[in-house]
From Swiss-Prot:
Pfam families in UniProt: Oxidored_q3 (PF00499)
Protein's organism: Brassica campestris (Field mustard)
Catalyzed chemical reaction(s): a ubiquinone + NADH + 5 H(+)(in) = a ubiquinol + NAD(+) + 4 H(+)(out)
Keyword Electron transport: yes
Protein name: NADH-ubiquinone oxidoreductase chain 6
Known role: Core subunit of the mitochondrial membrane respiratory chain NADH dehydrogenase (Complex I) that is believed to belong to the minimal assembly required for catalysis. Complex I functions in the transfer of electrons from NADH to the respiratory chain. The immediate electron acceptor for the enzyme is believed to be ubiquinone.
Amino acid sequence: MILSVLSSPALVSGLMVARAKNPVHSVLFPIPVFRDTSGLLLLLGLDFFAMIFPVVHIGAIAVSFLFVVMMFHIQIAEIHEEVLRYLPVSGIIGLIFWWEMFFILDNESIPLLPTQRNTTSLRYTVYAGKVRSWTNLETLGNLLYTYYSVWFLVPSLILLVAMIGAIVLTMHRTTKVKRQDVFRRNAIDFRRTIMRRTTDPLTIY
Protein backbone atom coordinates (compact mmCIF):
# COMPACT_ATOMS: atom_id res chain seq x y z
CA MET A 1 0.00 0.00 0.00
CA ILE A 2 2.68 2.50 1.00
CA LEU A 3 4.85 1.44 -1.95
CA SER A 4 2.06 2.13 -4.43
CA VAL A 5 1.18 5.45 -2.77
CA LEU A 6 4.78 6.65 -3.08
CA SER A 7 5.68 5.17 -6.46
CA SER A 8 2.56 6.18 -8.43
CA PRO A 9 2.95 9.98 -8.00
CA ALA A 10 6.67 9.63 -8.76
CA LEU A 11 5.94 7.93 -12.08
CA VAL A 12 3.24 10.44 -13.02
CA SER A 13 5.46 13.40 -12.14
CA GLY A 14 8.33 11.88 -14.12
CA LEU A 15 6.11 11.67 -17.19
CA MET A 16 4.88 15.24 -16.71
CA VAL A 17 8.48 16.51 -16.73
CA ALA A 18 8.75 15.53 -20.40
CA ARG A 19 5.17 16.41 -21.40
CA ALA A 20 4.88 19.85 -19.77
CA LYS A 21 4.86 22.69 -22.30
CA ASN A 22 5.77 25.40 -19.82
CA PRO A 23 9.46 25.20 -18.85
CA VAL A 24 8.63 26.34 -15.32
CA HIS A 25 6.28 23.40 -14.87
CA SER A 26 8.89 20.99 -16.21
CA VAL A 27 11.32 22.32 -13.60
CA LEU A 28 8.82 22.01 -10.73
CA PHE A 29 7.55 18.50 -11.53
CA PRO A 30 10.75 16.71 -10.38
CA ILE A 31 10.07 17.89 -6.80
CA PRO A 32 7.36 15.22 -6.18
CA VAL A 33 9.66 12.66 -7.79
CA PHE A 34 12.46 13.38 -5.32
CA ARG A 35 10.04 13.58 -2.40
CA ASP A 36 8.50 10.18 -3.10
CA THR A 37 11.89 8.65 -3.89
CA SER A 38 13.21 9.79 -0.53
CA GLY A 39 10.17 8.15 1.06
CA LEU A 40 10.99 4.88 -0.70
CA LEU A 41 14.59 5.11 0.50
CA LEU A 42 13.28 5.67 4.02
CA LEU A 43 11.20 2.51 3.77
CA LEU A 44 14.32 0.60 2.73
CA GLY A 45 16.11 1.76 5.87
CA LEU A 46 18.51 4.12 4.08
CA ASP A 47 17.82 7.11 6.29
CA PHE A 48 20.93 9.07 5.31
CA PHE A 49 20.22 8.77 1.58
CA ALA A 50 16.58 9.63 2.21
CA MET A 51 17.70 12.87 3.85
CA ILE A 52 20.45 13.87 1.43
CA PHE A 53 18.50 13.01 -1.74
CA PRO A 54 15.88 15.80 -1.56
CA VAL A 55 18.34 18.32 -0.12
CA VAL A 56 20.77 18.02 -3.03
CA HIS A 57 18.29 17.63 -5.85
CA ILE A 58 15.78 20.26 -4.72
CA GLY A 59 18.69 22.70 -4.40
CA ALA A 60 19.63 21.90 -7.98
CA ILE A 61 16.00 22.47 -9.00
CA ALA A 62 16.09 25.91 -7.35
CA VAL A 63 19.17 26.88 -9.37
CA SER A 64 17.72 25.52 -12.61
CA PHE A 65 14.44 27.34 -11.89
CA LEU A 66 16.46 30.54 -11.54
CA PHE A 67 18.14 29.93 -14.89
CA VAL A 68 14.84 29.13 -16.61
CA VAL A 69 13.05 32.22 -15.32
CA MET A 70 15.90 34.59 -16.15
CA MET A 71 16.92 33.14 -19.53
CA PHE A 72 13.47 32.56 -21.04
CA HIS A 73 12.20 36.01 -19.99
CA ILE A 74 9.06 34.64 -18.37
CA GLN A 75 6.94 37.45 -17.05
CA ILE A 76 6.23 37.27 -13.34
CA ALA A 77 2.77 38.74 -13.90
CA GLU A 78 1.82 35.76 -16.04
CA ILE A 79 2.90 33.39 -13.28
CA HIS A 80 0.81 35.26 -10.69
CA GLU A 81 -2.25 35.07 -12.94
CA GLU A 82 -2.06 31.28 -13.03
CA VAL A 83 -1.62 30.86 -9.28
CA LEU A 84 -5.36 30.91 -8.59
CA ARG A 85 -5.94 28.30 -11.29
CA TYR A 86 -3.66 25.80 -9.60
CA LEU A 87 -4.82 26.39 -6.02
CA PRO A 88 -7.30 23.45 -6.00
CA VAL A 89 -4.69 21.08 -7.44
CA SER A 90 -2.07 22.21 -4.93
CA GLY A 91 -4.59 21.83 -2.10
CA ILE A 92 -5.38 18.25 -3.13
CA ILE A 93 -1.67 17.41 -3.38
CA GLY A 94 -1.08 18.92 0.07
CA LEU A 95 -3.91 16.88 1.59
CA ILE A 96 -2.55 13.71 0.00
CA PHE A 97 0.91 14.49 1.39
CA TRP A 98 -0.39 15.01 4.93
CA TRP A 99 -2.48 11.86 4.65
CA GLU A 100 0.67 9.95 3.70
CA MET A 101 2.55 11.40 6.66
CA PHE A 102 -0.15 10.46 9.18
CA PHE A 103 -0.58 7.06 7.57
CA ILE A 104 3.13 6.22 7.82
CA LEU A 105 3.72 7.60 11.31
CA ASP A 106 2.84 5.42 14.25
CA ASN A 107 0.23 6.62 16.71
CA GLU A 108 2.67 6.37 19.60
CA SER A 109 4.78 9.18 18.14
CA ILE A 110 1.79 11.57 18.17
CA PRO A 111 0.83 12.37 21.78
CA LEU A 112 -2.56 13.87 20.90
CA LEU A 113 -3.89 10.67 19.37
CA PRO A 114 -5.31 7.92 21.62
CA THR A 115 -2.57 5.42 22.42
CA GLN A 116 -2.16 2.42 24.61
CA ARG A 117 -1.74 3.21 28.32
CA ASN A 118 1.86 3.26 29.43
CA THR A 119 2.30 0.48 32.00
CA THR A 120 6.09 0.18 31.89
CA SER A 121 6.43 2.21 35.10
CA LEU A 122 4.65 -0.60 37.03
CA ARG A 123 7.19 -3.20 35.93
CA TYR A 124 10.79 -3.70 36.92
CA THR A 125 13.40 -1.75 35.00
CA VAL A 126 15.39 -3.61 32.37
CA TYR A 127 18.64 -1.71 32.03
CA ALA A 128 19.67 -3.59 28.91
CA GLY A 129 16.85 -1.92 27.04
CA LYS A 130 17.88 1.54 28.22
CA VAL A 131 21.09 1.45 26.21
CA ARG A 132 20.54 3.70 23.24
CA SER A 133 21.64 2.53 19.82
CA TRP A 134 22.68 5.28 17.42
CA THR A 135 21.39 5.19 13.87
CA ASN A 136 23.40 6.17 10.82
CA LEU A 137 21.66 9.52 10.57
CA GLU A 138 22.28 10.40 14.21
CA THR A 139 25.93 9.41 14.00
CA LEU A 140 26.56 11.45 10.87
CA GLY A 141 24.69 14.43 12.28
CA ASN A 142 26.68 14.32 15.50
CA LEU A 143 29.99 14.21 13.64
CA LEU A 144 28.99 16.75 11.00
CA TYR A 145 27.60 19.44 13.30
CA THR A 146 30.10 18.91 16.13
CA TYR A 147 33.53 18.21 14.69
CA TYR A 148 33.17 19.16 11.03
CA SER A 149 30.93 22.21 11.24
CA VAL A 150 33.43 24.39 9.36
CA TRP A 151 33.52 21.99 6.43
CA PHE A 152 29.73 22.02 6.46
CA LEU A 153 29.61 25.83 6.14
CA VAL A 154 32.27 26.16 3.43
CA PRO A 155 30.22 24.37 0.70
CA SER A 156 27.22 26.54 1.55
CA LEU A 157 29.32 29.66 0.91
CA ILE A 158 30.55 28.17 -2.36
CA LEU A 159 26.97 27.48 -3.44
CA LEU A 160 26.00 31.04 -2.49
CA VAL A 161 28.79 32.45 -4.67
CA ALA A 162 27.71 30.16 -7.52
CA MET A 163 24.11 31.35 -7.26
CA ILE A 164 25.17 35.02 -7.26
CA GLY A 165 27.36 34.32 -10.28
CA ALA A 166 24.43 32.72 -12.10
CA ILE A 167 22.31 35.82 -11.44
CA VAL A 168 25.05 38.14 -12.70
CA LEU A 169 25.67 36.08 -15.85
CA THR A 170 22.02 35.89 -16.85
CA MET A 171 21.16 39.49 -16.01
CA HIS A 172 20.34 41.47 -19.15
CA ARG A 173 21.17 45.17 -19.12
CA THR A 174 19.24 47.34 -21.52
CA THR A 175 20.49 50.67 -22.80
CA LYS A 176 17.05 52.28 -22.85
CA VAL A 177 16.82 52.61 -19.08
CA LYS A 178 18.55 55.68 -17.65
CA ARG A 179 20.98 54.79 -14.89
CA GLN A 180 23.44 56.71 -12.76
CA ASP A 181 26.88 55.69 -11.64
CA VAL A 182 26.71 56.22 -7.89
CA PHE A 183 30.50 56.20 -7.45
CA ARG A 184 31.02 58.89 -10.09
CA ARG A 185 28.18 60.98 -8.70
CA ASN A 186 29.71 60.94 -5.22
CA ALA A 187 33.22 61.67 -6.53
CA ILE A 188 32.21 64.84 -8.40
CA ASP A 189 33.12 68.15 -6.77
CA PHE A 190 29.97 70.24 -6.78
CA ARG A 191 31.97 73.51 -6.76
CA ARG A 192 33.42 72.69 -10.16
CA THR A 193 30.26 71.39 -11.76
CA ILE A 194 27.62 73.79 -10.49
CA MET A 195 27.96 77.27 -11.96
CA ARG A 196 26.26 80.29 -10.53
CA ARG A 197 24.37 82.25 -13.09
CA THR A 198 23.80 85.88 -12.34
CA THR A 199 21.29 88.06 -14.16
CA ASP A 200 21.06 91.79 -14.22
CA PRO A 201 18.20 93.23 -12.21
CA LEU A 202 15.26 94.39 -14.21
CA THR A 203 14.86 98.11 -14.48
CA ILE A 204 11.39 99.51 -14.83
CA TYR A 205 11.04 102.79 -16.70
